[in-house]
A protein has these predicted regions:
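Short beta-strand edge segments in extracellular beta-sheet folds
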Residues: 102-108
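Surface-exposed, short loops/turns at beta-strand junctions within beta-sandwich domains
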Residues: 75-82
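Short edge beta-strand/loop segments characteristic of extracellular beta-sandwich folds
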Residues: 32-40
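Short acidic/polar inter-strand loop motif in beta-rich domains
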Residues: 91-100
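Sec-dependent N-terminal signal peptides
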Residues: 3-12
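Solvent-exposed serine/threonine-rich low-complexity stretches and specific carbohydrate-binding patches
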Residues: 55-68, 102
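Short, compositionally biased P/S/T/A/G/V-rich stretches that sit at domain boundaries
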Residues: 13-33
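Solvent-exposed loop/turn segments flanking beta-strands in beta-repeat/beta-sandwich domains
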Residues: 40-52
Length: 108
């Protein structure tokens, strides 16, 4: 029974986490990268912030369960060492959710 409860808790927590997809997974200096952050609907969601850790980010306001699920942006002219890609969902209850994906720039 203990394992069942722990597994169920992990599944519920994972269902609330954002998902991040990246196209392409690596680029040359000055290349373009399209990222899509998928945010499960939740009445406590207030904002989504996504982008590169050390270069640039963008944010969008969320309206709880009325918010769009996918948020997409094209970053052009990616520099050397922009950092990892991330997607963070800011929540009203302070239990923010974040996913991080490594990214590589070649030719630096």
């Amino acid at each position: 029974m203990k394992w069942f409860i722990m597994t169920l808790a992990l599944i519920v927590a994972a269902a609330e986490d954002p998902m991040l997809s990246v196209i392409p997974h690596a680029t040359v200096v000055g290349g373009n990268v399209r990222i899509t952050c998928r945010v499960p609907r939740n009445p406590k969601n207030r904002a989504v912030v996504f982008g590169f850790e050390d270069w640039t980010t963008t944010s969008r306001q969320l309206y709880g369960e009325e918010s769009p699920i996918t948020h997409q942006i094209l970053f052009e002219g990616v520099p050397c060492d922009p950092g990892e890609l991330f997607c963070t969902v800011l929540r009203a209850d302070g239990k923010d959710r974040k996913v991080v994906v490594p990214f590589k720039v070649v030719g630096c």
